[in-house]
Amino acid sequence: MTKNLITINQFIQKSLGEWKSIRSTHSLAFQEVENSTSKIEIKELESNNKNVLGLLEKYNYTSKPSFIALSISWKAISDWEIDQKIEQDKTILLFLPKDKNKGIVLRNKGYTESVISSSEYLIDENENLNIKTIYSSTASEERICFLSNHIRSRYSVIRNNENNTVIQTSHTSEIRNMSILKD
């Protein structure tokens, strides 16, 4: 019996909303640990959004492919920073399915390097979203899974492309902000 896997559209619909996040990052190269907390908001964007159309243009898409567009914004505070100032940013992701469980992700900025980046995604047999991005000197592998409808877990590994050594790992626990769901 074949299991019907969750589709990328279903995974994204489950991810929409506001999340509270706690992340621990281990920099193996510098033997340092960073802990951070953040508020993350994931919104679906319309296909005719000017930023979405601009991103498609940057990737030289002349026709409009089938895609799901997201805006992810965050505000974070880290124990890495001495002054404990709040960092904030946002990114746009376009998921272009090749089939119901795998495809390409286009971003206006990368996860490990602040340049536009293209990734491959796959939803595995455990319904985890796996995203792999190859940059000029590093590769990022990220896995996002739902532990329940309101709890997500993210794991990431950054490797050196030259010798495949692990440079950094991180684990993030995300809890949906339930207060915004109440009337």
Curated annotation (Swiss-Prot):
It comes from the Bacteria. Its EC number is 4.-.-.-. It is an enzyme of class 4 (lyase). GO terms for molecular function: lyase activity. Keywords: Lyase. Pfam families: CpeS. Belongs to the CpcS/CpeS biliprotein lyase family. Acts as a chromphore lyase, covalently attaching 3Z-phycoerythrobilin (3Z-PEB) to its target protein CpeB (phycoerythrin). Binds the isomeric chromophores 3E-phycoerythrobilin (3E-PEB), 3Z-PEB as well as their precursor 15,16-dihydrobiliverdin (DHBV) but not other chromophores tested. While it can transfer 3E-PEB a non-physiological adduct is made. Chromophore is bound to the lyase in a ratio of nearly 1:1. Homodimer. This is Phycoerythrobilin lyase CpeS.
